[in-house]
Amino acid sequence: MRKKNNNYDHTEKYTEIGYNIAYYRKHANLTQEQLAELVGISRAHLSAIEAPKVNRNLSVELVFDIAEALHVDAYKLIKVRE
């Protein structure tokens, strides 16, 4: 089992991922409710993912589902600045 290393703070990366998802969702003319329904999560969960400064863990599977629903490559959702 992997031991959690508390020396890393990924808040900014989660924020960028959330911004990316929101950007492509809006570009697809979808509401949070519509996208959430397409990928099988609650609107509140999607809202938390898109919210700035919220460390909302999301699975790779969910990233793939969101990317497919938005018709974008998954890497575009997780592309973050180093």
Where does each model-flagged region fall?
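Recognition helix of helix-turn-helix/homeodomain-like DNA-binding domains
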Residues: 40-56
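Short, basic-rich loop-to-helix N-cap that marks the start of a DNA-contacting helix
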Residues: 53-68
